[in-house]
Amino acid sequence: PLAIEVIRRRLEDRGGGLARVGGQLRLVEGMALAREEDEFKLTFYNTLTCWIAIDPLLALFGLDRAALADADRVAAAVRTLAARMPTYVTLKDVKKRWGNGQEDIFPVLQWEKLWGDMTTLPEADTLFFSVPRPRGQQLKEQAQLDGWLRDGSAAYIENLCAWE
């Protein structure tokens, strides 16, 4: 039910990518890799663009369209499938600003389930296809904007839209 767009990976791309694990092609998060440098061995990077066939996806959850009206059944199905997927625990710094230029920083644990980990499920029948970098490039920090503008990616996106 899933088709995921990937791009050729560049050195500055962070966060994992496409890998073969136990004979199965799937997305692997950078934080799930045993060694940080293993990320540089990955050839393709996730664009975060996913095409979904609704009825097969619902079937993966043990649901159909009619079942969507039953909130309790949907919640139970989501919890059951989520229990089969990895959970990541990350430490984040949360800032609380107060007064004039004052702030406190609190360490916070964040539990995450990631959509890309649906590809860990063999019955998800996931396909991957390579797209041009301008179509799927992720920008994760401001420092990437200059390169994005210079390499033609910004112009590519601009030409997709009618700006008024």
Question: Where are the regions that the model predicts?
Answer:
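Catalytic core of tubulin tyrosine ligase-like
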Residues: 1-164
